[in-house]
Amino acid sequence: MIKIRLSRHGMKKKPFYQIIIANVRSSRNGKFIERVGFFNPFAKKNEEKIRISTKRIQYWLEKGAKKTNRIKNLLIQFKKISSNNIKI
């Protein structure tokens, strides 16, 4: 099964997440199929907080990929995908 999920990077107490497409059996920071964006929860005012390729997300959702709850909430919070298209 394929999932859209977060992969943690960055420094201690200052996380930086990559939004990835990965097999469920892969470890959190392990092998992934494609990187479709990033999320920086500690971005400063002049920095980009989130970047997502919505076309690639839609492509993988059509192929049967599932989203984690955190990804679903991020997509709705930053209005990258309408909440009508979100099904988990």
Curated annotation (Swiss-Prot):
Database matches in Pfam families: Ribosomal_S16
GO MF term list: structural constituent of ribosome
UniProt keyword terms in alphabetical order: Ribonucleoprotein, Ribosomal protein
Gene3D superfamilies named among the record's database cross-references: 3.30.1320.10
Protein family (similarity comment): Belongs to the bacterial ribosomal protein bS16 family.
Gene from which this protein is expressed: rpsP
Protein name (record): Small ribosomal subunit protein bS16
GO cellular component, one term: small ribosomal subunit
GO biological process: translation
Domain of life per record: Bacteria
